[in-house]
Regions:
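ATP-dependent carboxylate activation and anion-phosphoryl transfer catalytic cores
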Residues: 15-199, 336-339, 344-358, 406-512
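Conserved N-proximal alpha/beta basic substrate-recognition cap immediately N-terminal to
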Residues: 19-20, 133-135, 139-275, 288
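Active-site nucleotide/adenylate-binding loops and adjacent lid/helix of ATP-dependent enzymes
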Residues: 21-24, 67, 198, 222-380, ...
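Short acidic-glycine loop/turn motifs at beta-strand connectors
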Residues: 217, 332-336, 412, 452, ...
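Extended, charge-rich helix/loop segments that form flexible
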Residues: 359-416
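Walker A (P-loop) phosphate-binding motif
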Residues: 498-549
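Flexible active-site lid/hinge loop adjacent to a nucleotide/diphosphate
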Residues: 544-672, 703-710
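Adenine nucleotide phosphate-binding catalytic loops in nucleotide-utilizing enzymes
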Residues: 610-618, 632, 652-748
């Protein structure tokens, strides 16, 4: 299956072109159909948006026949020079533009470049002409449909403006795509975990429009929501949210924490501060992200003001002893410290002419500063209560002109974005892990105050807070130091490496074709169930779980398979699909353990997809074999040469089946010792017997008469062989296969 960007656009230029002099503007390229393919498809393994384009009169005007087109495109999108296209070298696409390529191909590259500029590299696109002149199928990779459609809209507008020599504003287009990305994409914490799981070939399913994600399939799945997992208990999270109770719990277990007390009024805050001793910290009891926290307070007025700042951020307000030192955030995952950062105060320095407001405006231009979920450093807001309090303590206002060299402190806490993992003393790590265990969190962010993180904890630091669902961005994009692979640490915690390469996966069997595939699906599901796995089946005859029908309508589609793969009870899944579903939706799974192709019938029903002859079905049906895992198997009908020829595409083993023992494909496969030392595996009928063969070795499973279903019902022979071959590919024993067939009660 092709996966590279901008595969060569194969079309030769027509010799007939019309002059452009005195010609009216070109009509818009028509977008006839848009289809989001959510899984592996005829194009690639990942989601793509497929667009049918009608070029209209532009069919007669490739890129080298429209004066100024290429100059306008490269002026708006200068990085098109980086697109290699089918040429395979930098500038390849520019060569195609200059030599003449059609507008569907140009639109593909325009959209890819807009996505690149918006911060989401697309990396893949293709354009192919269909049987109708001037109509093309164009696809580009994008994991989110809403983002893809926005990119298509603006790419279309940009191209038409370039064609017709009209103005176009590139910045608003990029901004619109960025907005769609921010609205639809996973947050940085969730995203880095999903990406890490992907590196280990663990599949994921997004369960809502937010950050709730399933990693893995069926019973092997785990769920995450930002940096929380399904191992994060509600009780532990509730404890962590109650800062005062957390401190008391930690103190009872010998963990150093600052002395403090919940207060109800500003007056009580002042009284408690006097009892504890100055300086003090005032903060909300259940806040986060350092909101409402004010440090190192001495004065009554400041303490009462700090109370007012903390109160809206939590249910209660805490006054606690201020501990001198530097703020640190240690990330604990599965009983290990996997990342650590420290903070620093934020100050600006006067130049004798600029106001504080002007100095802060310059500070906020730092590209590392921005909205807290996207950037390691926050913007400084002079209207924020904590900042105002700091300025009041220094007797300056936003409009004060700051003398040359004078420092103005703006922020004492937050923005712990300087990596320091390599400096963490084992004793400090011990207390961080201990605190996480006491609270009961598998993933926790420890806010600690330390004079020196490289020294033992006692006497020079304390744990301030234990945070559930900690932000990970500070560890992914520290302002100084090395980024840490925190996403992989969490993925490894959820799916231990010792689980092997199949972590997160259940046996998935994918079956495509038209010949009794519902029967095959259900019989394979029954045999898997007998082998000890609670098995789900999604077929055209409904959905089954543990051989119990849970849905009567057709589930041989993306939606049915998706429901099955999200079911936490399913220890194995058998999924029937169709050529139409592959063309209109894509497969619902990224890979399967066994892929079965029974036939390539049905092109007559696919004319609306420009499938007009039998030979075109190979491109569709190969999708099922393309997704077979390298440790899996492809099961192919050797009675049909066009199906047997798919064997060359399979990354795993191939098991053939045939109604004839003398089948030439079977004979060649059994003799092939390059793939398997003993020779290939095959299932066939010899006389009246069903034979399982590995190379020259043969085992009789039983006669066709003996392999009847419960009640003596005789199944269709090719369908029976397909099911037997699939079960055998799943390493179900021949004895169990034979016994299971005889006990299978089938009613369509």
């Amino acid at each position: 299956m092709p996966t590279h960007q901008g595969q060569e656009f194969k079309k030769t230029c027509s010799p007939h072109f019309y002059p452009l002099s005195n010609m009216a503007k070109f009509n818009d390229i028509q977008l006839l159909r848009t289809t989001f393919l959510r899984g592996p498809s005829v194009w690639t393994y990942r989601p793509v948006l497929e667009v049918w384009l009608d070029l209209g009169e532009l069919e007669d005007y490739p890129s080298n026949k429209i004066p100024g087109l290429n100059d306008r495109l490269t002026a708006w999108l200068p990085d098109l020079i980086e697109h290699t296209c089918g040429v395979g070298e930098r500038g390849g696409f520019i060569q195609r533009l200059e030599g003449g390529t059609w507008m569907g191909h140009v639109l593909e590259h325009v959209i890819i470049e807009l996505l690149n500029l918006a911060g989401m590299p697309a990396e893949f696109g293709q354009t192919r002409e269909i049987s109708k002149r001037g109509v093309y199928r164009m696809v580009f990779r994008c994991p989110e449909e809403a983002v893809a459609r926005v990119a298509l809209e603006h790419g279309h507008k940009l191209l038409m403006a370039a064609i017709n020599d009209e103005p176009f504003e590139i910045k608003p287009a990029i901004h619109a795509i960025k907005t769609a990305i921010n609205d639809r994409y996973l947050g940085p914490s969730t995203g880095c975990i999903v990406d890490a799981a992907g590196e280990r070939r663990i599949p994921h399913i997004r369960l809502n429009d937010g950050n709730l994600v399933q990693l893995g399939y069926g019973a092997a799945q785990r769920r995450i929501w930002t940096a929380e997992s399904d191992q994060t208990s509600a009780i532990a999270e509730g404890i962590a949210q109650d800062k005062d109770f957390t401190k008391r719990l930690l103190a009872a277990c010998g963990v150093p924490v600052p002395e403090g007390q919940i207060v109800a009024t500003p007056e009580e805050a002042w009284e408690v501060a006097q009892d504890i001793g100055f300086p003090v910290t005032v903060k909300p009891s259940d806040g986060n992200h350092a909101r409402g926290v004010t440090l190192e307070l001495y004065q009554e007025a400041d303490i009462k003001t700090a109370f007012a700042l903390a109160q809206p951020e939590g249910s209660d307000v805490i006054v606690e002893r201020f501990i001198d030192g530097t703020e640190h955030r240690l990330l604990v995952v599965g009983g290990k410290v996997v990342a650590a950062t420290k903070g620093e105060t934020v100050s600006v320095y006067g130049n004798g002419t600029a106001t504080l407001r002007e100095l802060v405006a310059v500070l906020n231009l730092d590209p590392r500063r921005g909205p807290e979920q996207e950037y390691p450093l926050d913007w400084i807001n002079l209207d924020a209560g904590a900042v105002k309090l700091e300025l009041n303590r220094q007797h300056v206002t936003p409009d004060s002109v700051i003398p040359q060299g004078q420092a103005v402190l703006l922020q004492r806490n937050g923005n712990m974005a300087i990596d320091c993992l390599d400096d963490v003393h084992p004793d400090v790590a011990y207390y961080a892990v201990l605190a996480a265990k006491i609270v009961g969190l598998d993933i926790a962010g420890m806010d600690m105050i330390l004079k020196d993180v490289s020294q033992p904890m006692q006497g020079q630091g304390a744990i301030l807070e234990v945070n559930a669902g900690p932000g990970l961005l500070m560890h992914l994009k520290p302002t100084s130091g090395a980024p840490r692979p925190v996403g992989m640490a969490i993925a490894d915690h959820l799916f231990p490496r010792e689980d092997g390469p199949g972590a997160g996966r259940i046996p998935v069997v994918g079956i495509v074709g038209t010949r009794n595939n519902a029967f095959i699906s259900r019989l394979v599901g029954w045999l898997l169930q007998l082998s000890g796995k609670l098995t789900g089946v999604a077929s055209s005859e409904g959905m089954y779980l543990a051989n119990r029908q849970t849905q009567k309508t057709n589930t041989a589609n993306w939606a049915g398979a998706h429901r099955l793969l999200t079911n936490r009870l399913a220890q194995a899944a058998v999924i029937q699909t169709t050529a139409r579903s592959i063309l209109e939706e894509g497969l619902a799974y990224d890979r399967c353990l066994v892929g079965v192709v029974t036939d390539m019938d049905g092109f007559e029903q696919l004319a609306d997809h420009d499938v007009l002859e039998a030979g075109q079905m190979r491109r569709v049906m190969r999708t099922q074999i393309d997704v077979v895992l390298d440790g899996g198997a492809g099961v192919l009908n050797a009675d049909l040469p066009e199906v047997a020829d798919l064997a060359e595409l399979c990354d795993g083993e191939v098991v053939l089946y045939s109604t004839e023992a003398a089948n030439e494909f079977i004979a060649a496969h059994r003799a092939n010792t390059e793939v398997q030392h003993e020779g290939g595996r095959a299932v066939f009928v010899k006389g009246n017997q069903v034979v399982l063969a590995t190379g020259a070795q043969e085992r009789v499973l039983g006669t066709l008469d003996a392999l009847s279903l419960a009640g003596g019902k005789r199944p269709d022979t090719p369908a029976l062989l397909a099911a037997i071959a699939t079960a055998w590919a799943l390493d179900i024993t021949p004895d169990l296969i034979g016994a299971g067939i005889k006990t299978f009660e089938y009613q369509a």
